[in-house]
């Protein structure tokens, strides 16, 4: 290639990459094809020029993005989801069977506002009177749906010598405790208060501690509050193994203590068993709960699986009606559409939660309408059908442990609810 032609091409490439004077790729291709046809360039040289143009344009676009978008905006990560749900509930003993459609919308962001400081917020559908649901029913003659502040917090993560990670969180936050299931804490519950999270890596073992204090009700003479503390560890003892199952084997366990203070004046205890606040006895004077949790996880054929167990014991309740436990298994993770190894998730859980084992306003609201005094099974299946989009079905089979209607019914005759939820979830 002649020197004059090299300079001509360099000039053309530079001109083509300038903002406001860009040329269509087809025009560049025509020019390069002409130079190949008249022998000025070989096909290999033309390909090199095309790659150079592409790389130069990409680098220039990245530089322009940095110049146009301020640093503060680039530090923010936006995310959200929409969930459409069709739900059927078959209730035996009440006659109140229902078939309804529901929607959930969540949108928020988290961003780095200083070297060790992160801010997070999220708005969601829901209600200011229901702490364990972000659903809205589609049954109000096209009425508008309410949006509420679901999360808003600051997280400070200072560098502490000798400790892998320390986080101080204040505001409205997600559950600061490590959990495997929603028996004690519903997944939609947002926590108002302050928390400290500490973790320390020690070879294949990671030790962690979580603690916090949360305000429940400040309008009473003696304000209601919740203190929580959790100590735990996770270990991967066979990280160097050639076996896929052993290499990915991970054992995690934790013991938590939950101390509710002055909740008897605020709790909606002993109310209608069909409502969300269903089943704590009116005589329950306190909730001091020990909550050990364990999970064994691994992977086989690129398919993750785990076994988990959860137990809760309220030391402040009478000697009966103060225990609960859940056992379950999860297989797969629905992330890649229609993939045999990464396109599905299935699971099963058995749960038994006695009347005063847990504070009934915060337990899983989907399992029989929420509340305690229940036992039953949960089965689910999720399929990744599109990028960032899943279809799922979940079945709940729940019945009372103690007859709430005072009829002395046998276990087979007590209140039962079978629930089917079919969800379409899209994340963005």
Spans of model-derived segments:
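Surface-exposed loop and membrane-interface regions of Gram-negative outer-membrane beta-barrel proteins
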Residues: 85-104, 109-163, 177-186, 309, ...
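N-terminal periplasmic/intermembrane-space "pro-region" immediately following the signal or transit peptide
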Residues: 7, 11, 15-94, 428
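Surface-exposed coil loops of outer-membrane beta-barrel proteins
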Residues: 128-244, 256, 261-284, 357-370
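N-terminal secretory signal peptides that target proteins for export/translocation
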Residues: 1-5
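Short loop/turn motifs that connect adjacent beta-strands in outer-membrane beta-barrel proteins
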Residues: 66-78, 113-116, 159-166, 201-210, ...
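Transmembrane beta-strands of outer-membrane beta-barrel pores
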Residues: 84-90, 115, 123-129, 172-176, ...
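Outer-membrane beta-barrel pore domains
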Residues: 89-97, 137-144, 167, 245-250, ...
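Transmembrane beta-barrel architecture of outer-membrane proteins
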Residues: 77-83, 100-104, 146-151, 191-193, ...
